[in-house]
């Protein structure tokens, strides 16, 4: 897929609306032709209900709703969209799957589909068609979307995390560029605190930011929850080293981070209370849209590499699940394929300035990643990530460990001094073992 210009992306987003110039007859013909080209056709009389998480970036919701309306216009299938808080999507999805009633499509997190794979619509044909059209899936996306060789969900992308910092404060701290390793990160954090601009990283049960940076912290030092055979492997010198690093890092933090959820670091950064955090592009988006003076000073950098010597990152992967109880499985496939197709996906990424990083390789050429250099660090988040089940396989156990915030809690306990690093990792291993015995 060649690189598209921003003008071309905007034209894609216009879609069938450009047919308005043809008059009502021409518009009807254009709509019918576009619908005929859709590879997955809905059932006659289908109607859908979709549940998704509440947006952090307004452009995401605006273009999503337009794409839904466009689908309805093309197919005649009405779609009701419900929005839930990030923390509430997971339990609501689990209840719906288990009672066999609820939304036809649920957009959930990480490996949620692996908790109830047999209660989902087989999406293999949809995934294979999208992969052929758009350069293939990144390895992490394939890992999350498949189980035993079958696609059980369609990765929508990942709300990528990067280091978000104030460029002027970085220089005041004596750094010309953001450190590329964890040792340099600790030096920077100490310097920022000394200058009155402390860092702040979420250590509460935050679905996104808390999970993302604590898994990176563990993995970047060589730690892991389980080995390749899904056997608990938390207790190790590498895990202890990661928790000792967390303790030193925490000493530089602004007070209160152990209770922070996904919105807290955004608010603290925009208020000028912290000079560094791990976050999505939403902070920059809010500053730009709000015309805040700090927008020009906000910078982004990829998460530093730790002692393992290579990127070991987790990002907030979100997946579209077709629920097996749906009366309209063909319409479910049709809508999901439609939303993932370039005519809808690329303009949606543009509108949200890259809040979601693509799971399909061809979409890396979207000009949203290069039109503003501050967007670029988020472009490769899915390419750089591994699954939260590392180093084992995804499944019920990995999903439950994630839902129970085992890694976040372990890091928070060791960092804050509630437990020693040894005590924290031993407690975490017991929790991991409980799930992996099932």
Would you name each region that the model predicts?
Residues 148-156, 161, 186-232, 274:
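Extracytoplasmic/periplasmic solute-binding protein
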Residues 42-43, 69, 78-79, 118, ...:
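Conserved C-terminal helix/tail region of periplasmic/extracytoplasmic solute-binding proteins
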Residues 112-115, 212-216, 243-334:
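Extracytoplasmic/periplasmic substrate-binding proteins
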Residues 188-195, 229-258, 303:
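Glycine-centered hinge/linker elements that transmit conformational signals in sensory
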Residues 1-20:
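N-terminal secretory signal peptides and thylakoid transit peptides that target proteins
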Residues 36-42, 109-162, 186, 213, ...:
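Hinge/lid segment of periplasmic solute-binding proteins
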Residues 66-137, 146, 168-180, 268, ...:
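Extracytoplasmic "Venus flytrap"/periplasmic binding protein-like
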Residues 140, 300-302, 350-408, 413, ...:
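Long, aromatic- and glycine/proline-rich binding clefts that accommodate carbohydrate-like moieties
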């Amino acid at each position: 897929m060649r690189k598209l210009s921003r003008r071309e992306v905007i034209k894609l987003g216009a879609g069938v609306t450009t047919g308005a110039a043809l008059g009502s007859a021409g518009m009807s013909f254009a709509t019918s032709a576009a619908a005929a080209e859709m590879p997955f056709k809905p059932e006659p009389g289908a109607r859908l209900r979709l549940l998704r998480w509440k947006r952090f970036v307004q452009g995401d919701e605006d273009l999503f709703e337009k794409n839904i309306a466009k689908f309805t216009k093309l197919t005649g299938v009405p779609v009701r969209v419900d929005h839930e808080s990030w923390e509430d999507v997971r339990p609501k999805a689990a209840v719906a799957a288990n009672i066999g009633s609820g939304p036809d499509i649920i957009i959930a997190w990480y490996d949620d589909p692996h908790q109830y794979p047999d209660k989902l619509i087989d999406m293999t044909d949809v995934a294979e068609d999208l992969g052929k059209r758009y350069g293939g899936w990144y390895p992490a996306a394939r890992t999350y979307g498949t189980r035993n060789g079958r696609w059980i969900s369609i990765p929508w992308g990942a709300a990528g995390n990067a280091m978000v910092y104030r460029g002027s404060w970085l220089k005041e701290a004596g750094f010309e560029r953001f450190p590329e390793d964890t040792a340099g990160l600790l030096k920077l954090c100490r310097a920022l605190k000394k200058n009155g601009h402390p860092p702040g990283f979420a250590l509460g049960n935050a679905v996104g930011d808390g999970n993302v940076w604590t898994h990176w912290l563990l993995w970047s030092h060589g730690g892991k929850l389980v080995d390749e055979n899904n056997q608990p492997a938390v207790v190790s010198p590498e895990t202890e080293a990661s928790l000792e690093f967390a303790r030193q890092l925490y000493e530089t933090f602004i007070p209160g981070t152990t209770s922070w959820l996904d919105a807290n670091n955004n608010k603290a950064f925009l208020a000028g209370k912290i000079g560094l955090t791990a976050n999505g592009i939403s902070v920059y988006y809010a500053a730009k849209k709000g015309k805040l003076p700090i927008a020009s000073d906000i910078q982004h950098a990829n998460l530093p590499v730790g002692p393992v010597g290579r990127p070991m990152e987790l990002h907030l992967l979100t997946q579209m699940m077709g629920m097996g109880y749906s009366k309209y499985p063909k319409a479910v496939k049709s809508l999901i394929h439609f939303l993932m197709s370039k005519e809808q996906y690329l303009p949606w990424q543009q509108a949200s300035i890259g809040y979601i990083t693509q799971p399909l390789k061809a979409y890396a050429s979207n000009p949203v990643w290069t039109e503003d250099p501050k967007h670029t660090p988020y472009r490769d988040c899915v390419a750089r990530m591994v699954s939260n089940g590392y180093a084992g396989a995804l499944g019920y156990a990995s999903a439950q460990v994630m839902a129970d915030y085992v890694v976040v809690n372990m890091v928070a306990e060791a960092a804050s001094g509630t437990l020693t690093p040894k005590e924290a990792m031993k407690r975490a291993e017991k929790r991991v073992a409980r799930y992996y015995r099932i």
